[in-house]
Amino acid sequence: MILPDRWGQGQLFAFSALDGRALAGDDFPGMLCGDRVGVRFFSHVRRELAIVPLSGPGLTFDAVTSDCLVFGFPGQERMRMVYARPHLIIGSVAGCAMPAVFVEGPCRPERDGDTEIHDTLDGDVTALARCGDRFAFAFGHSREEAILLAREGLALSPEEEQARKLSFYARHGVGDDHPYARLYAKCLSVMKSQLYAPEGEFATVWSTPDRLPHQHMWLWDSIFHAVGFRHVDATLAQDLIRAVWVHQRPDGFIPHMADVGLTSDITQPPVIAWGAWQVYAFTRDDSFLREAYEHNARFLAWCRVSRRLTARELYTWNTTSDVNCRCDESGMDNSPRFDVPGPLAAIDFSCYMANDVRHMALMARTLGLEEDAARYDGWFRQIRDDVNAALWSEEDGFYFDLDLSAGRLHRVWSAASFLPLFAGVCPPDRAGRLAEHLQDPASFATVFPIPSISRKDPTFGTDMWRGPVWLNMNHMICEGLRRYGCTALAEDILRKTVRFADQWYRDDGVIYEFYDSSNLRAPSRLNRKGAPFEPYHIDVRLQAIRDYGWSSTLLLDMLRQLYPEKR
């Protein structure tokens, strides 16, 4: 069994809903430290649990997963740190090593027998209990709660808890002969860490983009998570999609972000039907399909009424004046597409609508709703025709947004303009011209494809959606290329995506939010709405986020596509 074994600062360490009651409203997540074997926990006042001293040659790691760390020196017993229960980390040490807690703020330390207590006077308390080579570190909202949980933790076997955690990879990992077995296992590790248990309005398990710094649910992130999770647990994948419409309003609107008792007032790309159809291919659960169909019918109807500014079937995102996030609704927050102040008939929004409408027709036929299917077919044709009539530049051989205020194409060379392939709205000759752009080294054929902005565009850079590579775009564009018969090109892009993501996992121990299209700069050195900040510090959050959810789920799906025979 091959396990993730690369240590890297910023890796997630958290309790998963797959193992019990992981609540978003009472979470105690951590990240691996960069300067020692330790975990920094994100309570109100930050705390760090570290193993000290760990000096000398030959320290190796057998497992570095999102809830289990196994490590040690040659000739010694292996040491471990396991997230065994909600708010409880247990472990064992060897040699002269011992656990230590460091608190990054006001704290009233105490000792009660074998237990060290850290009360930060804000309602959060941690306790570290030790017995021989074992230790237990617990978080609570009172001194008594933390002490009790830590002492209960000493009764647990770190070795048995380690075996329980790592059995997940035995069940769901791939064979040792898979060329990317370790990357596959790393994807599983991140995926596991993203899951919260049912809570409040959420009747099912639900997911979050990265646990830290995002701790809420996002619409299209959840769909991308489901696409990966269908290979692990297709029933769970259905639940991740169900969670998306928990906060749907009576008028059909679905918020882009939600949590227990919390919703936003903007939406996100309509990809629900597409995602539900991918999951349905695994489950053949007609009741789930009907549920998704009914909720999404209302959502698409809301989009048609609320996000269309012309008589044509072209769709417009909500935008703001925030220069770093003009279009959060599109998911492409700071793309130069939105540098213009006026509204755009957006190529991506229109294509997401076309693609979801097309999948609604497939769902309707499967459910025996022939009249609905015919209606969705007609709607799809309307979007297809309007996209090709209004958003195509014959001179450039490319699709662009339409600046509705100026009445002309807004010529920003963005990866969003390849989404007509994904939506299936391209005539074959135009699909061929798009493929040419993807093979042009001066434009989109970068070392690590596909840049979010073409190299020849004056806005091309290294800041988030202004040049770096995003795996969700690669996934959708490659699906579109295959639809149009460009199989070799799609496979080449997927192979490069996997190869370079694996390279950076081996170097840095994490799966990143986005990557450098030249593959020369570490993703941690790329701008994220500003210059990068080192060391990694999520309270500042000006770095590519580490152990990112959809990067992991879609990488796993790409590996399944590239190596279908490897299980």
Residue map of PLM features:
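Extended glycan-interaction surfaces of carbohydrate-active proteins
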Residues: 177-215, 239-260, 309-345, 385-469, ...
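Aromatic-rich carbohydrate-recognition surfaces in CAZymes
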Residues: 215-334, 347-350, 354, 468-490, ...
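A short small-residue
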Residues: 336-339, 360, 476
